[in-house]
Amino acid sequence: MIVTTVALASCGSKAADSPPPTISPAQAAVSPAATEAPAGSVRPLAGRGEAVVFDVATSSSVVLNSDAAGGSALVTFPVTGPSRTVALPSPARAIVGDGSGTVYAATKGGYFTVNLGTGDAVARFDVDGENDTDFTAITRRADGKIVLGSASGAVYTLSSATAVGARLQIFARVDALVAEGDTVAVLDRGQTSVTTVDPSGSRQQHALRAGEGATTMAADPEGRILVADTRGQALLVFGTDPLMLRQQYPVPGAPFALAGSSRLAWVSQTATNTVVGYDLATGIPVEKVRYRTVQQPNSMTYDDKTGTLFVVSGSGAGVQVIPGAGS
């Protein structure tokens, strides 16, 4: 097995006049039917899980769920106790939480906020002048500013709940956003690239190629950016100050879902219904544990306090709960 640790220079800090040529975006593998019982327990979820976050204040995982008719809902799964479903007024594409009881969901023209404490307090915020914009990604910076990404390749940094403070249009598409402090990392599947945007929101800091077909991105508590190179069958680990590829490790089985924790980086293998925990502390990822999962493990989150890993099926097979994962 070959392990590669690479440090790359930035592709440049100046914004490009137009996006470079794109490739066909990579996707998760279509998982086979599960042939072994998943680790832990499985809680039912009617529909397809699209994304998941963990909210520390309510000790709950929150799943963005879609139904056959195209509607969206947030389904909250406490570590203990029954789940709760909150229907959203229109389809949502991505979610982020503040860890303090509020979840933000990107939708066409703006975003929703959901108060997890009450469960039914849904508010909509329309971004000024962007009624027809298809927002596909969302994150929240350390200073509380909301940042949205669009299908047309723009990143919007809001200066208030609805006002656009800065707009950066240099991407082919925006598939995921992750905030490290007030710096935002952008994943573009079409360019298979990771780019950091400065705190003003108006300037690209650095941009790097991300493997052969990057699909997902997550942050860990150590300030690292994890990226799944699904087409290239690898886990990529980036530092952010400056943006630099620090680790590249082969992960077979169409790696896709990611979750960072204080001890391990979690990667799902969608071709085999498996999740693997890697220790990144030595500079070379070391496999520490693996679990069988629900079919189509397309999204994950982790509760560091209880050591619980939540694996969400993208095919309707439910939400898998693995207590003490990695211990």
Where are these regions (language model features)?
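Predominantly soluble domains enriched in secretory-pathway, periplasmic, or organellar proteins
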Residues: 6, 11-327
